[in-house]
Design a protein with these regions (language model features):
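Structural signal for hydrophobic packing residues in well-ordered secondary-structure cores
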Residues: 17, 21, 42-51, 104, ...
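Compact, charge-rich alpha-helical regulatory domains located at protein termini
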Residues: 1-24
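Conserved beta-loop-alpha segment that forms the PLP phosphate-binding cup at the N-terminus of a helix
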Residues: 34-39, 104, 116-140
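Short loop-beta-helix segment that forms the pyridoxal 5′-phosphate
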Residues: 88-92, 96, 109-128
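Structured loop/turn residues at beta-strand edges in well-structured enzyme cores
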Residues: 8, 113, 188
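Conserved PLP-enzyme active-site core in the AAT-like
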Residues: 125-234
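Conserved active-site and cofactor/substrate-binding residues in soluble primary-metabolism enzymes
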Residues: 5-8, 33-40, 80, 95-102, ...
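N-terminal entrance/gating region of PLP-dependent enzymes' catalytic architecture
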Residues: 19-102
Length: 234
């Protein structure tokens, strides 16, 4: 093969790489493991951690205990469910359209909404899009979001807003973990106010009071959440 491509040694293939950038010795890695050995190794590592049905998890921040039905794994094994891309050819995506319809129906019932959309990648992008929609509807250029919203959500919103020139304001939280709604009075001409409940700390916000205060200032109210199943209790 080397003769076919016109070189004498394997090192000639890397001649464009400076010698001081080349690895001089073997990589500092353990010996390779078979799949069986690797499985045993990972089980041993997992056994060192306090986890499992015998423990209660209070990590929070999006890490919650869930029961996942076996049907979920089966459905995820089907190629038409691997992507969150919205199908535009219904004759090619009947299974995906069925799943989206079921999701929207259940989400609308759970949240008490007339309609629900499924064409967003996750809650963070949906939050950002909702705030941008509020700006378009109201014609205002400022929004306020609670700092008790999950940090990953807030980072996505900041990324969306970075090139727009719109103003993104923070609502602080109190020692109780709840959003300081009184600070809304310090902001004027807001297009929207966003609050998450249950919030990042697991506190249940007074969503009705937050919405009424936002509406009093002419702003739209955006309610976010990271754990949809919490609304089965709330």
């Amino acid at each position: 093969m080397l003769r076919a491509i016109g070189v004498d040694h394997l090192d000639d293939l890397f001649s464009t790489i400076p010698k001081d950038c080349r690895l001089k010795g073997a990589l500092n890695l353990p010996e390779p493991l078979s799949e069986w050995e690797l499985n045993d190794h990972m089980d041993a590592l997992a056994g060192r951690m306090a986890a499992g049905p015998g423990y209660q998890a209070f990590v929070g921040a999006g890490r919650y205990e869930h029961f996942i039905s076996a049907s979920v794994s089966s459905l995820l094994g089907r190629s038409e469910f691997v992507t969150s891309y919205t199908p535009y050819q219904p004759e090619m995506s009947q299974g995906t359209l069925q799943a989206i319809y079921e999701y929207q129906t259940l989400a609308a019932r759970l949240l008490g909404m007339e309609v629900a959309t499924a064409s967003h990648y996750d809650g963070a992008t949906a939050l950002a899009e909702a705030l941008l929609m509020a700006i378009r509807i109201t014609g205002r250029r400022r929004v306020a979001i609670s700092r008790a919203i999950h940090p990953h959500y807030r980072q996505v919103v900041r990324t969306y807003f970075a090139p727009t020139g719109y103003e993104l304001l923070d609502l602080p939280f109190l020692k109780t973990g709840l959003t300081d709604l009184d600070r809304m009075n310090d902001f004027h001409d807001l297009a929207a106010v966003a609050v998450q409940s249950p919030n990042f700390f697991g506190c249940v916000e007074d969503v009705r009071a937050a919405a009424e205060q936002a509406h009093a200032g002419g702003a739209l109210f955006v309610a976010g959440f990271t754990e949809a199943l919490a609304f089965g209790l709330l």
